[in-house]
């Protein structure tokens, strides 16, 4: 039913967003010296990257909504986002991504922001809209000294909003003494009504992360007004994705949803053949809905060549490199995004997991600690590192800090108690876990049974978890294939059959690579 489909969709999206279990305790031993050396090298690489920009680094904070009714947050955030995007096109400038910069909302201590994001300048501002008039106030701050470089009001008609954004970006570039060969980046133009419809949808999807159906309706209205407005064509793909195969609405059957998404991507590529987001969308759709890994890699590599700093493309490259068994590449993509998105919890999560795969447990623990400073939870993952490192007692202490999540906690208890030799406690946890009816619990039961050596039972639970008739079967399976707690299944003929059934053999995956641009 719809609930089970939603369960599966959410699980795959979480995998895309925050990673998946990884590492094989039977193959790799901890390499403490290598881990410490790698961590030192990483600090050196990060410092060198940041220092290469000198003082040319900036964070654009969310602008305040000063409208009379306080209902223009979509516009104030949207203006800040557009200025950020314009500045990000200047290769000589290190610009912190929205996902990190927009965490600092409201009254903030600028020197603290500068230290945590490692930037020299901060842009903050406000937007006040009244009828067809808009006032944008922007102020550039020398973040280290907490001193204003300049502050200015831009009073214009709403029709001139793009010019305001361009003017602010250009002034920042000039003040930071960055020489541009041309006139500098310019906002993608459309009419004011289309732009406001787009910003409302963008705010729902990207800031509030709610109401994708309403967002799609707003984007449809925007495209009816301006069918060539590229940002709307890119964003509506994400809106449609959330409901495809997970709605009673006939528009969102898999066949219809996929066809609509492909149509929007084709229109976007016809307008801008080199648009990185559109290329990446074309690629992941080939993988997600067609198991065409070769086309996926081709389009993602093109996207990275065209814009190696695109944060979403880097994220997709990171997650899927790890899924394809290229763990070092996954870490490299995580590092690349973290250089401009230092608070990216999903990047830190995937880095942690990939480091575990490589047996670099100290590096994994460092990534885990850093992630837990910017996101809630994380105790189960941290416990997994200790478990794989051979410290089941420490692992259990970590697991108990996240006992409110029943499936993950029971699964983790069972693993730890097994390693500690407390088989009665292990069996009680397994019994409780077996009574939970969810896909997540089915996978967890397969993990536990495989870990303790009950291979037949593990395959039975895995069979309940995997549904080859589901259109997202390949994505679910790709997470299973790198799950370390299923390692005991790898020598069983049924494991090879599972890979062959889905055409996800090691031989095929070895030929797929997403390349980090030079």
Predicted regions and their residues:
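Acidic, proline/glycine-rich low-complexity intrinsically disordered segments
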Residues: 10, 14-369, 373-374, 379-386, ...
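Boundary/linker segments of alpha-helical solenoid repeat arrays
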Residues: 230-231, 276-277, 310-312, 343-348, ...
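Solenoid-like repeat scaffolds
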Residues: 304-306, 336-343, 369-376, 400-407, ...
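Membrane-interfacial entry segments at the cytosolic side of transmembrane helices
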Residues: 1-10
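Terminal, low-structured helical/coil segments at or just beyond the last alpha-helical repeat
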Residues: 480-518
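C-terminal accessory segments
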Residues: 446, 450-454, 460, 465, ...
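Helix-coil-helix junctions within alpha-helical repeat/solenoid scaffolds
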Residues: 362, 378, 383-459, 463
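TPR/TPR-like alpha-solenoid helical repeat scaffolds
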Residues: 237-239, 353, 411-423, 475-493
